[in-house]
Amino acid sequence: MQKASVLLFLAWVCFLFYAGIALFTSGFLLTRLELTNHSSCQEPPGPGSLPWGSQGKPGACWMASRFSRVVLVLIDALRFDFAQPQHSHVPREPPVSLPFLGKLSSLQRILEIQPHHARLYRSQVDPPTTTMQRLKALTTGSLPTFIDAGSNFASHAIVEDNLIKQLTSAGRRVVFMGDDTWKDLFPGAFSKAFFFPSFNVRDLDTVDNGILEHLYPTMDSGEWDVLIAHFLGVDHCGHKHGPHHPEMAKKLSQMDQVIQGLVERLENDTLLVVAGDHGMTTNGDHGGDSELEVSAALFLYSPTAVFPSTPPEEPEVIPQVSLVPTLALLLGLPIPFGNIGEVMAELFSGGEDSQPHSSALAQASALHLNAQQVSRFLHTYSAATQDLQAKELHQLQNLFSKASADYQWLLQSPKGAEATLPTVIAELQQFLRGARAMCIESWARFSLVRMAGGTALLAASCFICLLASQWAISPGFPFCPLLLTPVAWGLVGAIAYAGLLGTIELKLDLVLLGAVAAVSSFLPFLWKAWAGWGSKRPLATLFPIPGPVLLLLLFRLAVFFSDSFVVAEARATPFLLGSFILLLVVQLHWEGQLLPPKLLTMPRLGTSATTNPPRHNGAYALRLGIGLLLCTRLAGLFHRCPEETPVCHSSPWLSPLASMVGGRAKNLWYGACVAALVALLAAVRLWLRRYGNLKSPEPPMLFVRWGLPLMALGTAAYWALASGADEAPPRLRVLVSGASMVLPRAVAGLAASGLALLLWKPVTVLVKAGAGAPRTRTVLTPFSGPPTSQADLDYVVPQIYRHMQEEFRGRLERTKSQGPLTVAAYQLGSVYSAAMVTALTLLAFPLLLLHAERISLVFLLLFLQSFLLLHLLAAGIPVTTPGPFTVPWQAVSAWALMATQTFYSTGHQPVFPAIHWHAAFVGFPEGHGSCTWLPALLVGANTFASHLLFAVGCPLLLLWPFLCESQGLRKRQQPPGNEADARVRPEEEEEPLMEMRLRDAPQHFYAALLQLGLKYLFILGIQILACALAASILRRHLMVWKVFAPKFIFEAVGFIVSSVGLLLGIALVMRVDGAVSSWFRQLFLAQQR
């Protein structure tokens, strides 16, 4: 088997998985149909006008306008309880002084002094609670779908009808200042705009101060009809510090001053709207649908009396989209075509002096216009697509017809209006609320055919991994010829499909194209492999997973079908990992494998191999198992609680040091983080020194000696700046900002340079040649010249290695007549593992920078836990047993589980609110401008760091048992005077070959790498398959969008990251292997001169 065949086959299997994921996703996460219809004054939804028509302004279209101007102040993440007085408190929170309570005191004062002029509402937000989706809802009155949450990195212009378009069409002057997301959503729509970068969540003041610089001068100038100010400081403070930090009190107090200043400048024809687009969790995050995230504040105020009654004791709860039709009608504009919100009828009552009958009639008129608009939208939408339930739609149309008939009768018979008005209002409200509920339920559209096809393709990919992992170690299995057939058929299928679409003039669907190519390549491979190989073997051998491992894997997969277990996966994963560890220990003891590997060298013809005495007993494996369980338990201390478990308390160690208030505690934690960093660096250097690779003069080891300390120093310096940036003197802030940009980039640049050096010179050995060596001596025996074929090279390389060991070992015993040594080489036995450990360390440093400082302790535990598991695995694998090399299923499963456990221990959860957005600004404190791929890459690297590290390090599962061959060696002692006999039987005194044993059988080595990669892909693949099945079966489950859909997305992205990392890790081993061959070839040529 060739090296290229291994990588190509694994890449092909990954492509099968990618095609299955893409096909399933295209059927599961569909967006709703966006209609391009627009409302206009020339096409009213139906007749109707307010009875107080003389109060309106001339030029109104559907309804006479009530206000000529509106000031809309959006305070991002203004949670409802932020507007509460000091005596209130959050449920399940102790009634203590909270930083966010009572800071918006001007709202309560206005409500008490002018109760008919103001109202405070609890705005109910529709998830997902990300900013861009909320802005779409606040301007269109429609609902975003789940998949739209992924668009929060890159905003796109709104094509649906919206308030901003209606305002500009009516000739109103719209002035905007604040969040630059509006620039992409409404390009060219504002008469004047002041945009500020919004994505830097560490910056609390730039956007807010920029708004304040222009807000009051713009108001005083009068050159506006609608003024929009979108403040971001509260949201950024939540992301950076959380709502319970003193900085939150400062930001809310600043917003309170802004509201007071606006109230003082308002004229009688102006309405002030203060709204939060969403709330935030107790950690300051948002994006999900928890109560704290979907509960936002909405405050309305006018210098003239608007409300006929005083505010209720408990603020009314209204859907957020209700603000859209309300503002449209109050300004005399058409309601946007796709709106499904319900007007806030109280605002159409006519004020405190109006009569109850006229107030109720005005409310009914506004509601009827609103209902006509929603009915028109439902009729148009149902004609364009079949999303809406026909039965429910028919019932709603009947309800609207009855309510509309009652309303028309009401206008024609004013004498009986008082008794009928409440009924008409109730019927119209029932219709509007029913229409909204139906749309929410129906817009979860699925393509069952694509979902089934994607699931089948994922299952087939898992099946290929399982079968091929067994075939890989079978001698003579023709992987390379078999791979050419499916690749050719895949290309033929893709070309035929593209040609068919071109013939019938249909748009090319890349997802379907990839699926056709995957199926076209999969079926021929399975047919040819089974016909030529699989049918000759017993069926039981094709499913090699041991019973206990299979049982634990089934438990693992069953978790994905329960929302409760998915939520509790952070606690279930350490339990399963501990079960695998105990299974390894018990199995080693039960099978009597707690011995050293049989340190045998390749016997010469006519000799027999020898066996060494035992190296370890059961206590050794038990100590390793206890150490692993202890690391697992310690890593579990760094946990983030899901929002569904309110009794849980997240670890305070996940927050950055900058959020800590006490200076002494911050310094102590900073010292602990630096100590963990130094410990990690020292452990890697000691390990490399232990096996001698650190003494190599090659560039990678020189970099480890000098470059790694520089990277650690840069990381520690960046942590110091980040933790104290807010406390820096004003004259040093420019310097601190510059250093915060330079240091992370320098660390990343050093890491990239180290990896480049490792790829260039991956063989880290030390070669010493003696001066004046006899030219007649040669190390090539029994060959007389350099190897002429790969077979010759594979045969003589182990002999060369043994000969150099023999010469080095016996140099003190040689006499001068024997002449000096020809050559001595060190560290060949750990050449593969040294490259892998160096690469993992270089990867870990930039990934560590993307996390909070105290996560460095988790990274230290990650390396320690991996080290213990590898040693436990090495304790029971006899590397010289005749036959192919293999890694047991329980070890591969435990390795994959450790990646999942570390994902949770680094403060992540498979939900959007738990994403660490701050990672996007590590090294880019000023933001990224219009670039979106780089922040997405940084956030992705932060989220899936554990997946990447464990996938790249997966080949260590194969290499480590050979590396540990040198431990506990007990060389047989020869009696004095027995040197001649020792020279006759040198194999009895030889040092262990360690990883050079892999070069004794290169075909077995490559087959073992392929099998390991297939096993790892199978473990990851069945997880994504289980998530897809759970999402399919439970697609109408109450928690599908809250639990199952996010879990599928995170597992899918995690699989892609892990598969790429696995290919990179195996490619690095292949690169080292090729470099070792080149090194030996050059040595052979040098010996012949």
UniProtKB/Swiss-Prot annotation:
Glycosylation sites recorded in the entry for this protein: N268
Residues spanning the membrane: 4-24, 457-477, 482-502, 510-530, 541-561, 575-595, 668-688, 701-721, 747-767, 830-850, 857-877, 944-964, 1014-1034, 1048-1068
Coiled-coil region list: none
Subcellular location: Endoplasmic reticulum membrane
UniProt enzyme class: transferase
EC number(s) recorded for this UniProt protein: 2.-.-.-
GO biological process terms held by the UniProt record: GPI anchor biosynthetic process
Entry superkingdom: Eukaryota
Pathway in which this enzyme or protein is active: Glycolipid biosynthesis; glycosylphosphatidylinositol-anchor biosynthesis
Primary subcellular site in the record, as a coarse category: endoplasmic reticulum
Assembly information from the UniProt record: Part of the ethanolamine phosphate transferase 3 complex composed by PIGO and PIGF. PIGF is required to stabilize PIGO.
Stated family: Belongs to the PIGG/PIGN/PIGO family. PIGO subfamily.
Entry protein name: GPI ethanolamine phosphate transferase 3, catalytic subunit
Organism: Homo sapiens (Human)
Gene: PIGO
